[in-house]
């Protein structure tokens, strides 16, 4: 965005822009401090829950709100009304062009997570206080620098929705108690199993020219002049990984439930043709992270190789990153 220097919630804005949840303006700006209307928030939540900005199925849906007919956001408002996500300013007025507050946004996102507005106390005179408390409990307000009772700026709306993507979904058990929604998934997980010695032939600038599994082979190659420019042998330890199938049960996030979004955390080893370690080779449009598990390195997520990558992340090589990906292989962002 042309005004990216003014954006504080950078990661949230970048991710939601990539997902189409929140968009910039035709002049290339984002206008992070402009406020969000209730209609705009209804659309954002619709896209968050459906992965699409097409709401034609709701164009002719009925509504109790008399002030949304002919409004550009009417289908999104009708959807959110049907899902119990929104409430009106009165029994018949939604006020689509009025700015949305942080408290109202918190309530909408809590219902998106799975809370029942009535059961959770998000209605009545204390709805704002209860919404703020539950939003805090569920991490929706993390890194949000805004007064919740006032009109919500675009960048902080993005931050709240971004937090909701990572929030655990909830449901109600037979006793009416709130429980986290769980899902079971299978994955191939790399575990660090041992360490082996490698012997590199390097030149006078310490650039690696060749690698051998034994000192004897490396010494012979050096003495025989097999590798041009090699001046010495440097030994190093290289980790060996064993890949095993792992089944685990985890809480299902909003991003997983509605957008098939997942995250994997690890050390960025490869971006395109650039690689941090010669043992991690790559071609074009490849991203690889080392997320192997050891006693001192238990990571979130298990996927380590991605091929649908549109952005160059070479500048992050060697850093610990979180990869956000959609479906099974499409990288949305690396943070």
Task: Label the predicted regions.
Residues 13-22:
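Mature N-terminal segment immediately following signal peptide/propeptide cleavage
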Residues 1-10, 23-42, 46-74, 83-103, ...:
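Feature responds to low-complexity, polar/acidic, surface-exposed segments characteristic
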Residues 265, 271-273, 283-284, 291-296:
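Extended alpha-solenoid helical-repeat scaffolds
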Residues 326-335:
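OB-fold/S1-family single-stranded nucleic acid-binding modules
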Residues 305-323:
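Short nucleic-acid-contacting surface segments enriched for D/E, G, S/T with interspersed K/R
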Residues 286-311:
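Beta-strand/loop nucleic-acid-binding surfaces
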């Amino acid at each position: 965005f042309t005004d990216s220097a003014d954006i504080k919630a950078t990661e949230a804005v970048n991710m939601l822009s990539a997902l189409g949840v929140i968009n910039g303006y035709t002049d290339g700006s984002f206008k992070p401090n402009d406020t969000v209307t209730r209609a705009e928030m209804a659309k954002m939540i619709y896209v968050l829950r459906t992965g699409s900005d097409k709401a034609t199925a709701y164009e002719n849906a009925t509504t109790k709100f008399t002030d949304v007919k002919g409004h550009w956001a009417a289908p999104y408002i009708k959807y959110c009304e049907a899902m119990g996500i929104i409430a009106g300013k009165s029994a018949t007025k939604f006020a689509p062009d009025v700015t949305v507050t942080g408290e109202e946004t918190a309530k909408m996102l809590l219902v998106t997570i799975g809370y029942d507005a009535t059961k959770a106390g998000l209605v009545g005179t204390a709805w704002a206080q209860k919404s703020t408390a539950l939003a805090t409990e569920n991490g929706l307000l993390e890194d949000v620098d805004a007064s919740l009772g006032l009109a919500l700026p675009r960048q902080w709306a993005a931050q709240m929705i971004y937090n909701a993507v990572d929030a655990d979904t909830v449901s109600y058990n037979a006793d009416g108690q709130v429980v986290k929604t769980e899902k079971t998934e299978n994955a191939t997980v790399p575990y660090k199993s041992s360490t082996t010695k490698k012997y590199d032939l390097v030149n006078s600038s310490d650039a690696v020219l060749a690698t051998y599994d034994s000192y004897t082979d490396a010494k012979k190659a050096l003495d025989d002049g097999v590798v041009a420019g090699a001046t010495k042998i440097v030994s190093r330890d290289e980790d060996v990984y064993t890949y095993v199938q792992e089944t685990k049960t985890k809480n299902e996030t909003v991003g997983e439930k509605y957008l098939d979004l997942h995250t994997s955390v690890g050390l960025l080893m490869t971006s395109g043709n650039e690689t941090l370690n010669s043992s991690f080779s790559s071609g074009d449009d490849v991203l690889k992270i080392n997320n192997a598990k050891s006693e001192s390195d238990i990571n979130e997520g298990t996927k380590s190789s991605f091929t649908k990558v549109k952005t160059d992340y070479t500048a992050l090589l060697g850093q610990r990153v979180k990869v956000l990906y959609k479906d099974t292989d499409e990288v949305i962002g690396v943070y």
